[in-house]
Structures are given as C-alpha cells and as structure tokens.
C-alpha cells in the first residue's frame, strides 16, 4: 500500500505495525521513542486514508490524551496498521 509520510513515499504491507518499520519511517522525519504506544513522541496527523487504518486502542487513546493530541486525525504513528487494501493511498504528516 502506498503511504506518503511528510512527502516521502513508502510501500507498507497490510497488517504490519508502522512501529516495526520505525528505522525506515524516521527517514521521513517522524521521530519515534518507545514504538509501543507509551511515550507519545510519534504523534502525527493522518491527512488521508484514516478509514484504511486500525482503530486506536484504549492505550493509544490514553497516550494521545496525555500528550494533548486530542484531534480525531491525530494518531501515534508507531501504532498504525493498514487493515484495508482497497485504498488509494494514505497520507501522514508529522506535527510541527
């Protein structure tokens, strides 16, 4: 699946948690910390394709709330998983 992160294109397969690819995704300017949804370092905005991604877990929602990321388009990049293949593309931008 085509995923564009801060303008850089990645091919990320369905079912793979983005945190497992942190070393690659960091090249697009997304910073990672713990990669397990606890630290909140990798908050980003899903600009396009949210419907293709997994729902946030309760743990992710708690972390987002704790770090002040309360908008519906904000997610922890490390917790994202593509669940649907019939999407055109997913676009993600890091927080400024």
UniProtKB/Swiss-Prot annotation:
This is Ferredoxin-1. Ferredoxins are iron-sulfur proteins that transfer electrons in a wide variety of metabolic reactions. Binds 1 [2Fe-2S] cluster. The keyword Iron-sulfur applies. Keywords: 2Fe-2S, Disulfide bond, Electron transport, Iron, Iron-sulfur, Metal-binding, Transport. InterPro entries: 2Fe-2S_ferredoxin-like_sf (IPR036010), 2Fe-2S_ferredoxin-type (IPR001041), 2Fe2S_fd_BS (IPR006058), Beta-grasp_dom_sf (IPR012675). Residues 1-95 form the 2Fe-2S ferredoxin-type domain. It comes from Aquifex aeolicus (strain VF5). It comes from the Bacteria. The gene is fdx1. Its cofactor is [2Fe-2S] cluster. GO terms for molecular function: 2 iron, 2 sulfur cluster binding; metal ion binding. [2Fe-2S] cluster binds at residues 34, 39, 42, 78.
